[in-house]
Amino acid sequence: MSEPFIFIGSYQVKPGHLEEARHRIREVSALVEEREPQLRSFHFYLDQARKRVICVQIHPDAESMATHMAVVANHLATAGDWLELGSSTQQVLGVPPAVLTDYARKYNEDLDSYSIFVAGFSRDVTERAMR
């Protein structure tokens, strides 16, 4: 069994673009929910100052992240309209797929990578709660 792939990205919202950010985040969340049934978890949070947004994604494997990058390609292409892309911090847990490392290199973003799985487990709490 392969280990999950986890992505955590934090981004600065451009001044005056908070409502646009909220709208776009809700749009991409709906798109991902509809088109990526394999994704285990996909959440956005704002900090207290409402200046930074963080995205936490839990994929069943790295291939799911590659699929995700294709699904959200149009969203990523316009994210610079409302996010300060140079302000991002990104952490990946697991071996990142080439499409993610290529994207980070293209946009000069650092990936803080923890690629060596040591131990752990996942539970599908949604499925259990529905029984």
Model-found features: residue ranges?
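Short S/T/G/P-rich N-terminal loop/turn motif that feeds into the first structured element of a domain
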Residues: 1-53, 60-71, 81-131
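A short, acidic, amphipathic alpha-helical segment used as a generic capping/interface helix at domain edges
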Residues: 73-77
